Amino acid sequence: MARPRLQFLGLMPWVQQTAIRGNMRATLSRPGQLADLVADRLGGRGAFRQLVVSSRGRMLRAFQAEEPSEGGRVRLRRDAAYESFLTFDALLAQGSTPDAAALRDDLDELLRSSLLTRGFMLNCGECRTVQFTPIERVGRTYPCTRCGALNSLTGDRWHRAGSEPEFYYDLHPAMRTILKDSGDLTLLLGNRLARLAEEYSDLAEVEFAEEGAGKPSFEIDLIAHRDGDLVIGECKEGDLGGGQTRQQLIAKRLDAAELLRADRIVFGTALPEWPTGDQDAVRTLASSRGIKAQIDFIADLRRH
């Protein structure tokens, strides 16, 4: 379907104007805002999509480790959750990069984009809290982030250090949240859709609400413009669920397809293959509603 206004306006403004014509409003959800923040730091959605399939992206998964602290990995409680912080050697040992030189290049790029922060594991002489302290906050003294005490940078403040403290790395909280909530799947689906396309752009995590409503009617994981076609995508770690839950999920994606006049609806999963029951349920409901959009199922999204 030709959409000259989409080419002129850009994808998000076009989606918003199309939603208004359907008496709805479209905005980035909180996950979408986080994805936008990271994409801006990297130089755009295309760069973000490439990150998740690169050695750098695979290396970042080490920060999601939930095992107790060991070796060069320290797990600390921060805010309401436990988070892992890693040394250079610990990142090298997890094997996403072939050698130390490649890892150094990856770390340099991620530090330049501020997705990683370099610092020290230090404890507080007053409250004894062990904390990650960014390198720019450390001089002859450093403040405790918990109690505010000013500590001297001396040997008794170093956590697990030998003769000198090691550098540790911290992952940006937005990227931690994206990985924890499977936000990489929309990027991986975007990569699949972008293959062999002459023109491709996309948005992640857009929510639609009726005018005046307090909460969204539905949220779309991915909206893409591919070689003139409007594509909406739904991403899952597993299947679509069952019973009424599955029917409601499918119905809302079909609502979005009708609102945006989508040419294609794509369901993606991290599972090795889509259950036949899910495929049948989608096609049956789409047929009953007269949906003309092409419907596709893509599995094994993390295989690349």
PLM features per residue range, with description:
Residues 1-304:
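Intrinsically disordered, low-complexity Ser/Thr/Pro/Gly-rich regulatory segments
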